[in-house]
Amino acid sequence: MTSQSFHCPACGAPLIPRGNAAVISCPHCHTSVIVPEELREESDAAQWTTLLFDNFASNDNNWLVGNHDSEYFSPLNQVIADGRYRWEAQVSRASSISTSWLGAYRVSDFHLTVNSKHILGSKAGSSWGVIFRVQDNRNYYYFHITDSQFFAVSVTKNGQWLNPIDWKRTDAIKPNGVNQLEVIARGTNLIFLINGQIVSEIDDDYYGQGVVGVAIEGYLSGEKIIFDFLDFTLRAPRGQE
């Protein structure tokens, strides 16, 4: 076992890794904390394999691209170029969402990491995030953030929205900067991280498996919004690939 320590991002207390555990509880503030991968025993890293790393140098993974007009966004232009997956949209109807997912990767347990930047639009007028355990366009989870430093986890079931985690504020979000979202799913346990900091954890059994992707949401009719997705990494337990 490693003797190295690291610090709790919530309270700053020193923490000691525990074997190959990916997540431990801080004994001082009781926050769930992800253990840096390099401090875990090798057996933990050996349990995972990278299914996909996409830095958007090309569209080899067949993401949704092109110009689209709908009652929700008009227009919506999605382009992969110069190492980014850019979404430019004019919101036609308030509280509209647009999604794109990878149908080739259906997983149950997984570790999903995505980096993105909000380029244009008001801080609270739109959000971006990751979708996971997607069944179809009416059934999936959505972990998303705003540049006003709020995040939420939503789930749509047959088109009806529920909020397992309602909007919460967190200083983990960097306004006007690149932000990283992570989801670690093991069975019904779902852990959510922003820029390496665990912001919430739930047990939820709406969907046990599905595909993964990204999404944007616009809340203000008439507003133009732009988001750049910079990379997309999906890992799964060995043997599940």
Regions found by a protein language model. Give the residues of each.
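Short carbohydrate-recognition loop motifs
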Residues: 74-96
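Short, aromatic/His-centered strand-loop micro-motif at the edge of beta-sheets
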Residues: 159-180
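Flexible glycan-contacting loops in extracellular carbohydrate-active proteins
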Residues: 202-231
